[in-house]
Amino acid sequence: MTSDAMVRLKLSCLFLCVIGFSIVTLLCLYLPDKQIAYNIGRLSAFNASILPSSHSVQLFHTKKNEEVVIAAVICGNRTSQALVMIKSAIVFRGNSDLRIVVIAEKNIQQEFDETLRYWRLLTNDSFSYEIHSIIFPKEHSDEWRKLFQPCASERLFLPTVLNHLDSILYVDTDTLFLSSVEDVWKHFSQMNSSQLAAMVPEHEDMNVGWYNRFANHPYYGKLGLNSGVMLMNLTRMREFDWISRLAPVLEKYRLYLTWGDQDIINVIFHDHPDKVYVYPCRYNYRSDHCMYMSNCKSAEEDGVAVLHGSRSTFQTNKQPAFRALFNAMSQYQLGSDPVKYLLEASASLLNETTSTNCGRLAPIFTHNMRLMFQTV
């Protein structure tokens, strides 16, 4: 082989290597986005096929099944927000025997009682409710009350406050159900005999995780837990002597508890990882899952089950898609056609947010509404 031929052969090999490397690089960059687009496109096509625009449903039939108990702690000016959350639970009651448990300051209990009594009339007595006062232990009472946000740490003491109940689904007031409440509750049956609570990871991505980058106290797993949507087996928590474990954590880490009660929960489950069940991010979907890129695969595949408007995303313009869904639920009147006045209203408001990263994922927010309203 001549020297010129040898040079041409080497150049050809180099060219092929460069082309091959470029193709592999492009595939690595492109395929994740393509997979997300495929998942969202699949939901869009499915959503369009299952519910004709003229379809109307009756939500509040009398068939009942397993009891689902949803509990929330309300203080200060959170009453309106909490009532929207409760409304969403009633809308997505499904076949469950729904019980709403309100733990609130005494000065706002009457408003809850009057509103929930009226909603029972509107919905054919489709749920029951009970109202309790906020109670903190005498030791460290003021500190517990002010930890993180007013009354937020009350949730730590629910095994005692609600000593007549076996299990609850605790939710923050800034949450919305976008799927059947039974969809979350079913995870109790998937917990093993040692697990006493269920939560989602605080983040899905190590690069943006809070606990792994900033926490100065122990936390669960690699990314910590978010406690905004928390299944609590109160019986097992009492057997675990949960309440007695709280004060020692507060005393040891009080200077480092940025997220208050959630941090205490993380410390306990760091020490007892066998006691917690971790379910997918679709059960506590936050703006972190979509504000930069979509990083909650379970929501892409099966839609959002519970939306969490943390960091005031329901009340501000930080995330227009989240505010759109909150406004649609806030404006919806119980007893009216949910297809026209909730599903279509949500879709219309979401359509105005498609210039945002979260808004581009609109099908994941309405997917379970369409399923629910078709099959009720």
Label each region the model flagged.
Residues 2-68, 74, 78, 220-376:
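A glycosyltransferase accessory/donor-loop signature
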Residues 80, 106-114:
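Short, charged/polar "capping" segments at the starts of alpha-helices
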Residues 88-96:
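Short, acidic, metal-binding catalytic loop of nucleotide-sugar glycosyltransferases
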Residues 98-107, 198-199:
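Short internal beta-strands
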Residues 113, 117-161:
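Active-site-proximal specificity loops/subdomain of glycosyltransferases
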Residues 145-146, 214-220, 294:
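Short, P/G- and charge-enriched loop/turn segments at secondary-structure junctions
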Residues 194-216, 318-325:
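A short, conserved beta-to-alpha structural element at the edge of catalytic cores
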